[in-house]
């Protein structure tokens, strides 16, 4: 699971914050050609488009929407249909 140091944080925003979190905790840890799941902490209830584009931008650039639909899954207990939300917001990049 992703570690968000500030447990009081419930919303994630900011392209640079997304990139920083991805670089520190995900990059090099997953094989994008195999199924993988990103787990957000339970308290997170909102992902801003800016955060999504920063965090998932590299994955999206490397494997595209088709690759993400096939291999990517996400667990975010407080966000309804998080995979669709993320993919839809990446289409705006």
Identify the function of each model-found stretch.
Residues 89-93:
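Amphipathic alpha-helical binding modules
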């Amino acid at each position: 699971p992703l570690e968000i140091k500030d447990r009081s944080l419930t919303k994630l925003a900011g392209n640079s914050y997304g990139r920083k979190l991805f670089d520190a905790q995900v990059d090099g840890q997953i094989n994008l050609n195999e199924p993988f799941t990103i787990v957000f902490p339970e308290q997170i209830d909102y992902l801003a488009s800016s955060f999504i584009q920063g965090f998932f931008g590299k994955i999206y650039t490397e494997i595209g929407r088709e690759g993400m639909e096939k291999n990517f899954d996400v667990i975010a207990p407080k966000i309804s249909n998080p995979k669709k939300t993320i993919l839809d917001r990446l289409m705006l990049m």
